[in-house]
Amino acid sequence: MNKFDEFIESNEKDLDVDTSTRNSIISMSPVRKTGRKIRSASSNGYRLEHHRTSSAGSMHSQRLMTPTRLNDQDHPLQAKPDARRVVTRHSSVSVPNAMSKRRSLIQPMVVPTTPESQNNLPSVSHSEGSYGIPLESTTVLSSEQAMASGLRRSRNGSSQSVNSMIATTIPTNGVDVSALLQSLATKELELLECKQKIEDLKKQTQHEEQNYTRRARELHELKEQVSKHLDPSLNTPVKNRAFSPVYQNIPLESRTENAGNSSLPSSVSKPKNMGHQSTNQSRSVSPQDIQERRQRDDSSDSSKQSLWSKPLALFNQFDKIIQHEIERTLNWDDSLSGTPEVQEGTPTSNSESSAQQYDNEAPGARQKSPSQGSVSRSLWSFVSDVKAGLLGIEEENDNDVITDNRCDPVYKSDRQHEQKKSTHKITNRGQAEDSGDDSSLNNEEI
């Protein structure tokens, strides 16, 4: 043993203090070296093994965590002869009271004990534990007494409740009035609740109908807006449709055809333009467009017959003019029979241009050879006829009546001038035939 250990032990004995609990360990191996067991003399009753080892030895040890009892006399709760007996009330006394309250509605089936039997029961019971330690009861009433008191109270409570029920349920003529009144009140409440539910459902249906009508109106407005965005011509009036982008995309020829002022070449291209318009406008169709199309179809049906008859008449005129000019160039026809045919085959435009050309020609040009004059005149008349047919000077629509009336005096004056010239030529030819001069005939032909 070291001097340090001896010094500690001597101080512990003098001060009556045990400081070995901080380093108390218990051996886990069977091999033990020199050591010393110290039994505490204090009143705490714990067994402590204080084992000290040298620095040279190695030893597996474990700290003692649980106290151990040494004997019955060292127990801290042991009753001493000079100590005063203290009786305390245990907390388990309130448990039977709670149990009695819970069992108050149940009628007891066990007969409670009498006070005589309660006096015979011991008030305090002593028992010894398995370890020889005397266990003192700290309760004033035992569990049997608590149960008996609880049963007695529950019996009293149940009897009182039965008496109260009997007093309140006194039958009157064999009918329970309170039960009837209660059922009547419940039925009235149920009826009121049903009426309230019906009114709520009616209000809800009205509200839903209003929402439905409002949403249907909004849907109709949205459809109109979408149709206006897709077809902007519906927004503009009829007068301003000429400036709309849809109307600007339509060719000028188709516009004149729809308006009634159509020429011959535009009439030929009308079916194609109508097909393009139908494909472009097939995406957005409205009742107004359908009515307008029907009106246009009805108005155009009458003009289609005359439009298709013009090309045939024009081709016939070209054929006659070409045939007549070829015959004149080859001198196959007579001079007398040729001039009326030319006047009958050519249109008014040809006669007008020939008359103007005849008046404007210089005197020296009239003295040319008859063959050159006839060829040039025939060529100029052919060009003027083709030009007049391509430009569509002849107008047959009702919208151009005013222009036709304005042009009638001019045509009349030209025709009168032509008739005067023809009569003058015929008189000259008659005189020449009578005289037998051929040179005058050639000059007249020129």
Swiss-Prot record:
Residues 290-301, 403-421 have a biased composition (Basic and acidic residues). The modification Phosphoserine is found at S244, S286. InterPro entries: Tda11. GO terms for cellular component: cytoplasm. Its main location: cytoplasm. Keywords: Coiled coil, Cytoplasm, Phosphoprotein. Residues 32-62, 252-306, 332-377, 392-446 are annotated as: Disordered. Belongs to the TDA11 family. This is Topoisomerase I damage affected protein 11. It comes from Saccharomyces cerevisiae (strain AWRI796) (Baker's yeast). The gene is TDA11.
